[in-house]
Structures are given as structure tokens and as C-alpha cells.
Amino acid sequence: MSIPAELKYSKTHEWIRIEGDEAVIGITHFAQEQLGDLTFVDLPGVGDTLDVEQEMGSVESVKAASELYAPVAGEVIAVNDALASAPELVNQSPYTEGWMLRVKLAATPEDLLDATAYGELVASEAH
């Protein structure tokens, strides 16, 4: 399973790529694998404000529906509009084409996991 070392992760299986004072957010390979083929992605709008651990949207798949939680606080400055008509991008390419949001950070993110710690979390949940 792919767990890119350059990213940070949340305990609720979102990935975060920090780019200066912005962050790009999506769900991890493990999360999309557990959900199965996505059929719908509901995301906040540009200009919405997120707080850490606040529900920020949801995804629906052939297996289940699941909430998405904000791993960082800030203002949504971009949304991946392609997911509205092609939610399968999250399954096909969770770390690149399947990104979900770009956020202007309100503060330096805390309590995020590095790739090693996230790998340990996934291993503990997979059993």
C-alpha cells in the first residue's frame, strides 16, 4: 500500500500536503480501499472555514457512506471540481488527481502523523 513519505496524515485517514501557508487535502489509499468504488463526493465550498476535526464533507461508495473530517484549520480556497462528475478519481489516484481541497492555513497544523506513524495506524486497523 502506498503511504507517501512527504505527506502528513490524520487519524481519520485524510492526507495533508503542506505547501507554505496552504495545505492540499484528500483521503488516503487505505481509506478509499476500505470504502470501495466512490460514487459521490460532497465537499465544502470555496470561502468556507474549517476547524480541526470538524466534519467537512462526505463520500459515498458502493459499500458505505463516510464523513470527512478537517485535519487542519483554515479557509477553503479551492475545491477539486472534477470529483463532482468523476468521484472515481479518488480511487484511481488518491494522492494526485483525487485531491479534494486546498486550504489557506489558519495556524501551523498539529497532531498530524508522519508516514511511519500512519503506517502503524493502518496496520493496527487492518487486523
Curated annotation (Swiss-Prot):
Binds 1 lipoyl cofactor covalently. CDD domains: GCS_H. One of its GO terms (cellular component) is cytosol. SUPFAM superfamilies: Single hybrid motif. Residues 22-104 form the Lipoyl-binding domain. Its cofactor is (R)-lipoate. It comes from the Bacteria. The modification N6-lipoyllysine is found at K63. Keywords: Lipoyl. One of its GO terms (biological process) is glycine decarboxylation via glycine cleavage system. Pfam families: GCV_H (PF01597). The glycine cleavage system catalyzes the degradation of glycine. The H protein shuttles the methylamine group of glycine from the P protein to the T protein. Belongs to the GcvH family. NCBIfam families: gcvH, PRK01202.1. The glycine cleavage system is composed of four proteins: P, T, L and H. This is Glycine cleavage system H protein. The lineage of its organism: Bacteria, Pseudomonadati, Thermodesulfobacteriota, Desulfovibrionia, Desulfovibrionales.
